């Protein structure tokens, strides 16, 4: 009797194991929805573990599986614990990143939170990155909208643009004024930039620009919408890290919607393990530009570039000066992750470097600080 029960239990265990294996295997053919799913703010689309369909990436402490992978761009992986046959796990941070402190609260590396109704934030290795939940507040109003202003809406968190119809004026008249001295940068604009205010481009014009734009713009005409757009693009910011992989940003409205967006690119001024003074020639105080001795793969969020490159890096000085990129170009680079997921990112490639005493990394105030559509910024005390 006991042997019969033991055989029955063994059969049940075997069937359960085979069922779990069948569920964990990938289908012979992929069948995906026609439209990609819409994810919550701050949540990206990734391919499932079978490499078939785009799904919303699972976040820190959320349940995960082969068909519901974690967000690898935030350094998360699906932790199945000690079980080798488990089908579901929990998203955990791949490495012990630094926690974040914001508004007297501690957030773990990879944790997402909403500090207010206008921002969705994520802690990434000690830095808090946020995206706006009210993008309409940060985009340019319709150029045909006279005297645009933001007003609060009852029962809603986000403000909306309204137009005053009292005085309708052609926004593109007096182009000499638009491209004249009014585009200069003065000290009063620093406060406006900090408060995310826009400055009128020309006298009597409803066109606006960001205070940080100091160069002459060009005018783009959209024949489909019958609108003209003053196209403006800032220079790329300094790399966020003096060694290792960092991020460089710029702001532009060079798009069909004429909407201000922040563009990012991966940058690496120099490897963190690069020898400091060993390559200096006798009598020299600086080593400006150095080329990688052998082809290397770029890394981003735990993923490797598909191709190998021989990038140039900036050297170092012994007299207190710092070496920073002088001429750069941006290339589109393809990355592949361990789960087979591939994606493209803009990457900075250094062409030449310069050495001087202007070292902006010694002062955090030197970093550009914008809050725009699709923005990711760092909160500072």
Curated annotation (Swiss-Prot):
Residue ranges annotated for the VWFC domain, each copy included: 98-164
Q: Which GO terms describe its biological process?
A: apoptotic process involved in heart morphogenesis; atrial septum morphogenesis; atrioventricular valve morphogenesis; cell adhesion; chemotaxis; chondroblast differentiation; chorio-allantoic fusion; extracellular matrix organization
Enumerate the SUPFAM superfamilies for this protein. Answer: FnI-like domain, Growth factor receptor domain, TSP-1 type 1 repeat
Residues bearing Phosphoserine are: 188
Q: Which UniProt keywords apply?
A: Cell adhesion, Chemotaxis, Disulfide bond, Growth factor binding, Heparin-binding, Phosphoprotein, Secreted, Signal
Superkingdom, taxonomy of origin: Eukaryota
This entry carries the following GO cellular component terms, namely: extracellular matrix; extracellular space
Which SMART domains does its entry note?
Answer: CT, IB, TSP1, VWC
Q: Which residues form the CTCK domain?
A: 286-360
Q: Where in the cell is it found?
A: Secreted
- Disulfide-bonded cysteine pairs: these are 26-50, 30-52, 32-53, 39-56, 64-78, 70-91, 286-323, 303-337, 314-353, 317-355, 322-359
Pfam families to which the protein is assigned, alphabetical = Cys_knot, IGFBP, TSP1_CCN, VWC
Q: Where is the signal peptide?
A: 1-24
Which intervals hold domain TSP type-1? 228-273
Tell me how this protein assembles.
Answer: Interaction with integrins is heparin- and cell-type-dependent and promotes cell adhesion.
Q: What does this protein do?
A: Promotes cell proliferation, chemotaxis, angiogenesis and cell adhesion. Appears to play a role in wound healing by up-regulating, in skin fibroblasts, the expression of a number of genes involved in angiogenesis, inflammation and matrix remodeling including VEGA-A, VEGA-C, MMP1, MMP3, TIMP1, uPA, PAI-1 and integrins alpha-3 and alpha-5. CCN1-mediated gene regulation is dependent on heparin-binding. Down-regulates the expression of alpha-1 and alpha-2 subunits of collagen type-1.
Q: What is the name attached to this protein's record?
A: CCN family member 1
Gene source species: Pan troglodytes (Chimpanzee)
The protein's gene is named: CCN1
């Amino acid at each position: 009797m006991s042997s019969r029960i033991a055989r029955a239990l063994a059969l049940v265990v075997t069937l359960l194991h085979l069922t779990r294996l069948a569920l964990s295997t990938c289908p012979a053919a992929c069948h995906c929805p026609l439209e990609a799913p819409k994810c919550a703010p701050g949540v990206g689309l990734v391919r499932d573990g079978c490499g078939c369909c785009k799904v919303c990436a699972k976040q820190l402490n959320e349940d995960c599986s082969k068909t519901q992978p974690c967000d690898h761009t935030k350094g998360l992986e699906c932790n199945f614990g000690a079980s080798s046959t488990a089908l579901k796990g929990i998203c955990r941070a791949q490495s012990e990143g630094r926690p974040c402190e914001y508004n007297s609260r501690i957030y773990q590396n990879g944790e997402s939170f909403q500090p207010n109704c206008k921002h969705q934030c994520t802690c990434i290795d000690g830095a808090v990155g946020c995206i706006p939940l009210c993008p309409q507040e940060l985009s340019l109003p319709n150029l045909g909208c006279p005297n645009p202003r933001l007003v609060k809406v009852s029962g809603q968190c986000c403000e909306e643009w309204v137009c005053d119809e009292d005085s309708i004026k052609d926004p593109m008249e007096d182009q000499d004024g638009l491209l004249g001295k009014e585009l200069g940068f003065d000290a009063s604009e620093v406060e406006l930039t900090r408060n995310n205010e826009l400055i009128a481009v020309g006298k009597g014009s409803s066109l606006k620009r960001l205070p940080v734009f100091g160069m002459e713009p060009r005018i783009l005409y959209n024949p489909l919408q019958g609108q003209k757009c003053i196209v403006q693009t800032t220079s790329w910011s300094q790399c966020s890290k003096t060694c290792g992989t960092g991020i460089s940003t710029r702001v532009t409205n060079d798009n069909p919607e004429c909407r201000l967006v922040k563009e990012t690119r991966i940058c690496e001024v120099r490897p963190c393990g690069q020898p400091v003074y060993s390559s200096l020639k006798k009598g020299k105080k600086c080593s400006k530009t150095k080329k990688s001795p052998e082809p290397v793969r770029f890394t981003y969020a735990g993923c490797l570039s598909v191709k190998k490159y021989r990038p140039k890096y900036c050297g170092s000085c012994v007299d207190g000066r710092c070496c920073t990129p002088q001429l750069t170009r941006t290339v589109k680079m393809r990355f592949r992750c361990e789960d087979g997921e591939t994606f493209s990112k803009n990457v900075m490639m250094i062409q030449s470097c310069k050495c001087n005493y202007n070292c902006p990394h010694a002062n955090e105030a030197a970093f550009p600080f914008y809050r725009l559509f699709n923005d990711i910024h760092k909160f500072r005390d």
